[in-house]
Design a protein with these regions (language model features):
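A short acidic/small-residue loop/turn micro-motif
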Residues: 90, 153-156
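Vicinal oxygen chelate
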Residues: 42-44, 101-146, 153-154
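Core segments of cupin and vicinal oxygen chelate
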Residues: 39-82
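N-terminal beta-strand motif that seeds the catalytic metal site of vicinal oxygen chelate
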Residues: 2-44, 103-106, 110, 159-163
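Short, charged/polar, Gly/Pro-enriched secondary-structure boundary elements
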Residues: 80-83, 144-148
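Short, well-ordered beta-strand micro-motif
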Residues: 76, 87, 138-140
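Helix-adjacent hinge/juxtasegments
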Residues: 82-88, 92-109
Length: 163
């Protein structure tokens, strides 16, 4: 790796700050992080670790709507924040097994009116959806991270209370 031009890096950082960091900002369109979803290779082992070892209460277990037989389960991280997991029984991950324990997606809660407006903005920007259900849109950010905009209140999932 070659030497970094730290002066140029700092100048670029300052240019971006000047262009985008405003002294007075509007309120965010988001209500908060609904949940961050990780992958689990063993549901019970994951529950024993996060609830038993770390003290994060298990709040709900439901079937993953996107993969029949998969469990979607949630832990309370406090302040309305959820940590979620998926398992994918029967799915041969093969060379992708290393993603176990990795990020599946980041779910951001927005109200339904804002959700529709953000959907229009995604459409206008030419962003392709990985999935869309009428209250949930999955898409990739510019670096490939999977993001979900979810028109569900914090602590609810598919109309069920999960917190």
């Amino acid at each position: 790796m070659g030497a970094m031009d730290l002066t140029a890096i700092e100048a670029e950082r300052q240019r971006i700050r000047d262009a985008h960091l405003k002294p007075e900002r509007p309120a965010s369109t988001a209500r908060g992080v609904h949940h961050v979803a990780l992958l689990s290779s063993d549901v019970e082992r994951t529950v024993r670790f996060y609830q038993g070892v770390l003290g994060f209460p298990l709040t709900e277990m439901i079937e993953n709507r996107d993969y029949q037989g998969s469990t979607h389960f949630f832990f309370d991280l406090g302040n309305g924040n959820l940590l979620a997991f998926f398992d994918f029984p029967g799915l041969d991950l093969g060379p992708y097994a290393e993603v176990l324990g990795g990020l599946h997606h980041l779910a951001i809660s927005v109200d339904p009116v804002t959700w529709r407006g953000l959907r229009e903005r995604l459409d206008a920007a030419g962003v392709e959806y990985a999935e869309e259900s009428g209250s949930s849109i999955y898409f990739r950010d510019p670096d490939g991270a999977r993001v979900e905009l979810l028109a569900e209140p914090l602590g609810e999932m598919y109309g069920s209370t999960v917190l």
